[in-house]
Each structure stands twice: as C-alpha cells, then as structure tokens.
C-alpha cells in the first residue's frame, strides 16, 4: 500500500466540486488501504479572498508546509490546486528533485477576468508554468484535454473522471404537492461567473428552484422573487431535491466538468445546458437532455426527449470507485529509484 500526499487550497468547509472530488478520492484511497495525508487550508492561517469573501485562502509559512511533507515521507505527491499550498508543495518537490502529478479543476483565467478583469493571458501563462513539470496533469474530460493542448500546456495529460454517490443520488417517487410543474432545478454556487442569470431569466412555465449560496444570492433573490432559493443542501436532503425536480438546468460555460450534471442524471433528471466543456462530454444523446447555444431551446428539447430511466442508467456509470482507480493509475513515485518511505 502507498503513502499518498494530496496538496489542496480547496477543502472543507467549502462546498464545491473540487472539495467533493478530493474528499471522496481520499476516502476511497483509505478504504483501499492506502495512507493519505491531505495538506489543506485549515492547517494554516487564512484570509478571505477580496472579491469572494466566502472563500478563504491560506497563507502558510513555507517551513511548516515543508515539514509536513517531509515528516509524512510520501511515495506519491498529487498537487490539486494552484494556490499558496499547491505552490509550496510544488516548490518542495522541485527542490528535492521529486516527481509529482497535478490536476486542472478550475478555469481561473475566465473567473479572474469576469470577477476582477485580470487578463486571461497572464493567468494562462502562470498555469502553463505551474503544470509544466507535472507527470502527469490530470483532466476530467476529453474536451478539456484538447483545450489545454491548444493553449500550449506541455505536460502529459491523463484522464481523471468524476463520480456520484449512488446511495444519495438516485430516482425517488416525486412528491405530489411541492411546486407547480415542471420544476426546473439549478444546483451550484450563486455567482455571476456561473452564468446563473441565463437560467433565471428564462420565460419558462412551472417553478425554478435554486440550491446553493454565493455572493450574488441576495441580489438575485430580490431581482427574481418568483424563483425558489433553498440555500445549501447536502447528503440525502440534496438527493431528495434532485429527485423532486423534472429537469436540471446547467447554465455555466466555465466549468471543467460539472459534478452536479452527473448527480442530476443519476437522480433521473434530463439536463439542459450549453455545449461547453463538461456537458458536451456527458450529455451525449437526446435521452440524456439537450445542448444548445440558446439555453431556452435546450430546455424545451430536453423536456421533449429526456428519458429519466436512461438518465439514471447513465448516471450509475459514474462511480467514485472507478475514479479512484483512474487516479491511482495516474500517480507517479516521487523518485524513479525511490523505495517506500525512503
């Protein structure tokens, strides 16, 4: 069994796809008998991100991070994020001559441009540098792999998909008296970079339901009083919300995968989305939903052609066990000649 160190700037209590992916992967690795150390923000002092105060970024002293890595004596190192913790663990590996893997979870260039007008080109330059010595760089989808190649990323790319907890996300009998039908559902961060208003402004029948929180929630609650904002939901409570809906709408154009899409499928919900990275790799035929540059048309088509049984069957193919096996196959020993714990 291996000693695996995962470095991440995203961890609990944040609620997002990156944290869910890393948390489930660490759980599965431990279940398989591996020893896992997660170097994460709660271990160090942190400050809120200026334009996104609900997210805190850690500011660790380098020596504290280096000591933690050295004491753990990893067989493999995976660096999951490009923030201060990721940078320090990357630097430690480079100083030691260790090999390491990384992963590309978040479209920071697009987000930073949208939130702070920071030039995309500069952020992509930084990301090419950060991942330049990865062996390999893990990506979730074929379309993201092709995009990173086209943007000049030179590290070897390997696939690392995502999973669904099928004990939580599965079809249930729909309640009869929830909201006027059809119920159109969005689950995710309530922020402008998620393009959520493209969903909220659609002139659809029935009820729009939003699960999640974020910096734009107060503004959008006032602007769209007919929309039901439920706040955060987790676990079985979230699974029940999915299965009570009729259609899942995913308006984001900047996600790298969209775990919520496969959670919706596993719950028996067709998906309406833009033909963007993530949905374009997942919604592969009309029974699963519809993709269109006009989100309203995608909603109409998904309501016509979506098949809940086909959606549930497709969602069941995304398991965390399979994802974790992919992750394990992609890991590299810190040194070609290293012996365990040496």
Regions found by a protein language model. Give the residues of each.
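Nucleotide-sugar donor phosphate/pyrophosphate-binding loop at the beta->alpha transition
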Residues: 99-101, 110-129
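Nucleotide-activated donor-binding/catalytic signature segment of Leloir-type glycosyltransferases, i.e.
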Residues: 218-236
